[in-house]
Amino acid sequence: DWKKSFRGYWKLMVYTIDYLKTIAPVDVIVISGNHDYERMYYVGDVIDGWYRNDDAVTVDNNNEPRKYYRYGTNMLMFTHGDKEKAQNIPLIMATEQPEMFAATSHREAHCGHFHKEQVNEYRGIKVRFIPSICPNDSWHKQMGYESKRTGQAYIWSKARGMEGYNQYNV
């Protein structure tokens, strides 16, 4: 039920953030999905409140459908990916964030809509659909959209772009 998944998700987020902040400051970027739009906002609000006095954690929980993050020469766009056509994402990035686009040389978009790994490159910009750690809900099961539960953590160099990732299979 939604209450169990809500509680489980924010507790998983707190556990993960607490671990990561022992290594480096943590920036949390909350992206709503097409099936959990309101719940993801609530989770983001809980996380923001939980860490309100913690200088090692920042939370971006605004309602923008696409969010951008700069790390050195890297430009990252985060979106659920159900509204945009993948091949249009590079132009969307350049249009919405022209200064960041011009100042960076490594650019990627991370999307989650398909709940499975899928990577395409358009004009030198990778559009990456990432797998989900969440179990399939009844709607996904009814539709036959089964996918392996997998989490991925990306390793970025400020100067050289993405250098690899770690994968965790649930």
What feature does the model see in each segment?
Residues 47-63, 71-170:
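Conserved beta-sheet core of the metallophosphoesterase superfamily
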